[in-house]
Amino acid sequence: MNETTPIAPAKVLPDAQTVTSVRHWTDTLFSFRVTRPQTLRFRSGEFVMIGLLDDNGKPIMRAYSIASPAWDEELEFYSIKVPDGPLTSRLQHIKVGEQIILRPKPVGTLVIDALLPGKRLWFLATGTGIAPFASLMREPEAYEKFDEVIMMHACRTVAELEYGRQLVEALQEDPLIGELVEGKLKYYPTTTREEFHHMGRITDNLASGKVFEDLGIAPMNPETDRAMVCGSLAFNVDVMKVLESYGLREGANSEPREFVVEKAFVGEGI
């Protein structure tokens, strides 16, 4: 359900930002939007530290990718609900008008600057790993620098894909980048447990060539293809091997190459 109300008066919180909307997608997934600090400048794909105070008044902070693009007036986040998670056990209950802590110091490797120029850009994500790509899919630079953008998103069930599906659908009608996206963005969602028209792990669909066949495109080529990866540790490791088998090399902000991996969230109890 969507909630939207006028912004409430600020409480005394360090780096406080006010929640402007909350949506629960499944019993384990939710997204929310907050006010944006006037001083915050970030590149689409980066993350910030957000949090809440615990019972003793101490901040519980975790890294969260900004799911909204750099041009958005608000900030959006997409989160899993962990019942016993130090932060998400509290964060999942936030309501419009309440506040969170947001440290306005964005960082991250999933930025276009960390890739060499190319023709095709792949976003490879599992679960809430789609968050940085929710930002990048709405980033005009992605479509100005690449001829094609391919979003591969794998979840266990169809319901868990809904956040990404609705985002891609809305992009087509977006007044700012709808025309840029047209004909360039390809969306390839898959499930790993529930029956769906596309099934299987991203690594398997890439390694077998099934995704290329389904989309009617050429296989990966280090001369033309660039990729960004965000998921669990096991996913990151496995997909890196597949990308390397196609001749792509891992890069970084300081040394742009053919693909980059976000490792900030791996193994983090949330």
From Swiss-Prot:
Residues 12-113 form the FAD-binding FR-type domain. It comes from the Bacteria. Pfam families: FAD_binding_6 (PF00970), NAD_binding_1 (PF00175). GO terms for molecular function: ferredoxin-NADP+ reductase activity; nucleotide binding. NADP(+) binds at T126, R156, T192, R193, R201, D238. InterPro entries: Cbr1-like_FAD-bd_dom (IPR008333), FAD-bd_FR_type (IPR017927), Flavoprot_Pyr_Nucl_cyt_Rdtase (IPR001709), FNR_bac (IPR033892), FNR_nucleotide-bd (IPR039261), FNR_type-1 (IPR051930), OxRdtase_FAD/NAD-bd (IPR001433), Riboflavin_synthase-like_b-brl (IPR017938). GO terms for biological process: cellular response to oxidative stress; heme catabolic process. Its cofactor is FAD. One of its GO terms (cellular component) is cytoplasm. Induction: Induced under oxidative stress conditions. It is an enzyme of class 1 (oxidoreductase). It catalyses: 2 reduced [2Fe-2S]-[ferredoxin] + NADP(+) + H(+) = 2 oxidized [2Fe-2S]-[ferredoxin] + NADPH; reduced [flavodoxin] + NADP(+) = oxidized [flavodoxin] + NADPH + 2 H(+). Keywords: Cytoplasm, FAD, Flavoprotein, NADP, Nucleotide-binding, Oxidoreductase. SUPFAM superfamilies: Ferredoxin reductase-like, C-terminal NADP-linked domain (SSF52343), Riboflavin synthase domain-like (SSF63380). FAD binds at residues 62-65, 78-80, 86-88, 128, 264-270. It is found in: Cytoplasm. PANTHER family: FLAVODOXIN_FERREDOXIN--NADP REDUCTASE, OXIDOREDUCTASE FAD/NAD(P)-BINDING DOMAIN PROTEIN. Monomer. Transports electrons between flavodoxin or ferredoxin and NADPH. Belongs to the ferredoxin--NADP reductase type 1 family. This is Flavodoxin/ferredoxin--NADP reductase. It comes from Rhodobacter capsulatus (Rhodopseudomonas capsulata). The lineage of its organism: Bacteria, Pseudomonadati, Pseudomonadota, Alphaproteobacteria, Rhodobacterales.
